[in-house]
């Protein structure tokens, strides 16, 4: 972006767009300002023909120069397609539709931590992989925004605070033409949809009022009240728009409908139920309208069947076997104290706190930590062995030099005595 247009043309374009200088490079806001100024400066609307022509010329040059930034690097080798200027109207959000924010970042906490090595195929991780490929294939030591559209280049250009960086970066990429990102839209992460057979056979029936993810709640979809017909069980690791930061309601938590109350009370007696057929989760979540029971539980022959009486079964005594299997001393499990969120936290910080608390009970993470500890101990032992070998070589060299010095002194004394006699 620093090499797009001259300094005078930059100032003139920003003056015509009526934007501050710090927004230079924000394609979405510049395009929105261009559309507004085009309506004001159009000759049919009473505007100036000269100013309109100058604005169109500078804006067209700006888009062409941004398009050529990565093309001038050469040797990228991973471009999927390159269209002409007529195909630049298709933005990234228009390409992926209403599920753009779900496909933009699969798991915020994991995708933000795995900077160098990630097998994720969301838009955030794919753009980071492009950054490394551009450095390797194009021998580009320093990349700026325009040559690369990854999160790090975005933060380096705009200096965005960490609190809202992912939300602002998602909006920045959403308005960017998909052709400029060199992304294969078929390889981008796409949540799989559940088939109708799996949805009917599932024990937990997801209501049709679960809504979209938190970042889609402020879009034109009715603040997340329109449900997703795919029936995909959404995870709570979702993003959130900056406009929702002032209202700390976690709309990412979903309202589920379960089988009748008596079944739930037998399986989970600690669950709090508010009506006869609907399970209500904890309070900090958006209140969705409830679906009528006749839509949740259609009448069928299986519902009319009476529950069979349970018969008591006799089991063989296996106390001795259990004593052999169980360890002699039980290892105490350290349960970390719950993380209590402070007042005034954004939903994004609340999600991270819940993920951190969940990580203490994740068996995969525990196994990974044990492997890291073993690897660290092996490296420490290897470094100790290497230090001992280096010390042995040093002692051997010192001994050799001392022996050589002694031989030289003996020869010197013998030669001196022979000359004396």
From Swiss-Prot:
Modified residues (Phosphotyrosine): 250, 315, 322
Assembly notes: Interacts with host Ppp2/PP2A A and C subunits; this interaction alters Ppp2/PP2A substrate specificity and localization. Interacts with host Src, Yes1, and Fyn. Interacts with host Shc1, Plcg1 and p85; these interactions lead to cell cycle progression. Interacts with host 14-3-3 proteins.
Protein name (record): Middle T antigen
Positions of post-translational Phosphoserine modification: 257
Keywords: Early protein, Host membrane, Host-virus interaction, Membrane, Oncogene, Phosphoprotein, Transmembrane, Transmembrane helix
Listed Pfam families: Papo_T_antigen
Ranges facing Cytoplasmic side: 1-394
GO CC aspect terms: host cell membrane; membrane
Record note on domains: The NPTY motif is required for interaction with host Shc1 protein.
Main location: host cell
Reported function: Plays a role in transformation by modulating the activities of cellular proteins involved in control of cell proliferation and by acting as a functional homolog of an activated tyrosine kinase-associated growth-factor receptor. Recruits upon association with host Ppp2/PP2A the Src tyrosine kinase components Src, Yes and Fyn, thereby activating their kinase activity. Activation of Shc1, Pclg1 and p85 mediate signal transduction pathways leading to cell cycle progression and cell division. MT also plays a role in regulation of early and late gene expression and in viral DNA replication.
J domain mapped to chain residues: 12-75
Membrane topology: Single-pass membrane protein
Subcellular localization: Host membrane
């Amino acid at each position: 972006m620093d090499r797009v247009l001259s300094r005078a043309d930059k100032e003139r374009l920003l003056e015509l767009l009526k934007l501050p200088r710090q927004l230079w490079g924000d394609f979405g806001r510049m395009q929105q300002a261009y559309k507004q100024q085009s309506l004001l400066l159009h000759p049919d609307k009473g505007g100036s023909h000269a100013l309109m022509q100058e604005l169109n010329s500078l804006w067209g040059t700006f888009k062409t120069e941004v398009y050529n930034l990565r093309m001038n690097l050469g040797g990228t080798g991973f471009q999927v397609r390159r269209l002409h200027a007529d195909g630049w109207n298709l933005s990234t959000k228009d390409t992926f539709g209403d599920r753009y924010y779900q496909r933009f970042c699969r798991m915020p906490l994991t995708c933000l931590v795995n900077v160098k090595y990630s097998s994720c195929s969301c838009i955030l991780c794919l753009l980071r992989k492009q950054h490394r490929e551009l450095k390797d294939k194009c021998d580009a030591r320093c990349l700026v925004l325009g040559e690369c559209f990854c999160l790090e280049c975005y933060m380096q250009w705009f200096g965005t605070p960490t609190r809202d960086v992912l939300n602002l970066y998602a909006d920045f990429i959403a308005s960017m033409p998909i052709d400029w990102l060199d992304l294969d839209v078929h390889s981008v992460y796409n949540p799989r949809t559940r088939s109708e057979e799996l949805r009917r056979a599932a024990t937990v029936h997801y209501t049709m009022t679960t809504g979209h993810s938190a970042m889609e709640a402020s879009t034109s979809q009715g603040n997340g009240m329109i449900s997703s017909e795919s029936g995909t069980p959404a995870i709570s690791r979702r993003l959130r728009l900056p406009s929702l930061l002032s209202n700390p309601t976690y709309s990412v938590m979903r309202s589920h409908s379960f089988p009748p109350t008596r079944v739930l009370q037998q399986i989970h007696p600690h669950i709090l139920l508010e009506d006869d057929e609907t399970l209500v989760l904890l309070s900090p979540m958006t209140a969705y309208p409830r679906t009528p029971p006749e839509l949740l539980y259609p009448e069928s022959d299986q519902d009319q069947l009476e529950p069979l009486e349970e018969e008591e079964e006799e089991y063989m005594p296996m106390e001795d076997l259990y004593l052999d299997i169980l360890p002699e001393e039980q290892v105490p499990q350290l349960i970390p104290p719950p993380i209590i969120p402070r007042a005034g936290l954004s939903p994004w910080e609340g999600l991270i706190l819940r993920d951190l608390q969940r990580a203490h009970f994740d068996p995969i993470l525990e196994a990974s930590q044990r492997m890291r500890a073993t690897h660290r101990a092996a490296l420490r032992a290897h470094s100790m062995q290497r230090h001992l070998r280096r010390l042995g070589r040093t002692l051997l060299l010192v001994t050799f030099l001392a022996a050589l010095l002694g031989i030289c002194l003996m020869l010197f004394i013998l030669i001196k005595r022979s000359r004396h006699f």
